[in-house]
């Protein structure tokens, strides 16, 4: 699973996702990709699951870029514990995603194969997404 090697602090504030993605909104590396249509949080397991779905469909051909990285920690308090007494323990990592953010890119396979692979990856993600093709193809 994806996770940062080292962080400055064990826990962090929750924060808010507001507005569209200012960076990472265009296809820069591949020819076709998946773009987020709504706010959400992608866990490292969801990112990896979608990557595996893409790789299994395109087999050995082509290259895949993952454009998001889970660098925010998710904390949880144990079940049946009263509120208060501090923040819960870290349990996993997630990537905050804003609308317009490109999540995955593919290059080196024909468009139909890439579209089918990305459609399979879309089913693994908890947010609405669309398939976008780089302009000029």
UniProtKB/Swiss-Prot annotation:
Signal peptide: none annotated. Belongs to the universal ribosomal protein uL16 family. Binds 23S rRNA and is also seen to make contacts with the A and possibly P site tRNAs. This is Large ribosomal subunit protein uL16. It comes from the Bacteria. GO terms for biological process: translation. The keyword tRNA-binding applies. Keywords: Ribonucleoprotein, Ribosomal protein, RNA-binding, rRNA-binding, tRNA-binding. One of its GO terms (molecular function) is rRNA binding. The keyword Secreted does not apply. InterPro entries: Ribosomal_uL16, Ribosomal_uL16_bact-type, Ribosomal_uL16_CS, Ribosomal_uL16_dom, Ribosomal_uL16_sf. HAMAP family: Ribosomal_uL16. GO terms for cellular component: cytosolic large ribosomal subunit. Part of the 50S ribosomal subunit. It comes from Solidesulfovibrio magneticus (strain ATCC 700980 / DSM 13731 / RS-1). CDD domains: Ribosomal_L16_L10e.
């Amino acid at each position: 699973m994806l996770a940062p090697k080292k962080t400055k602090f064990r826990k962090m504030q929750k924060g808010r996702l507001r507005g569209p993605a200012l960076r990472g909104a265009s296809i820069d590396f591949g020819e076709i990709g998946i773009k987020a249509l709504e706010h959400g949080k992608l866990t490292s397991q969801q990112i990896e699951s979608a990557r595996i779905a893409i790789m299994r469909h395109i087999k050995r051909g082509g290259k895949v870029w993952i454009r998001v990285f889970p660098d925010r920690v998710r904390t949880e308090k144990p079940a049946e514990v009263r509120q208060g007494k501090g923040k819960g323990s870290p349990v996993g990592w997630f990537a905050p995603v804003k609308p317009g953010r490109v999540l995955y890119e593919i290059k080196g396979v024909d468009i139909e194969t890439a579209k089918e692979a990305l459609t399979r990856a879309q089913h693994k993600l908890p947010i609405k997404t669309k398939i976008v093709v780089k302009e000029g193809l």
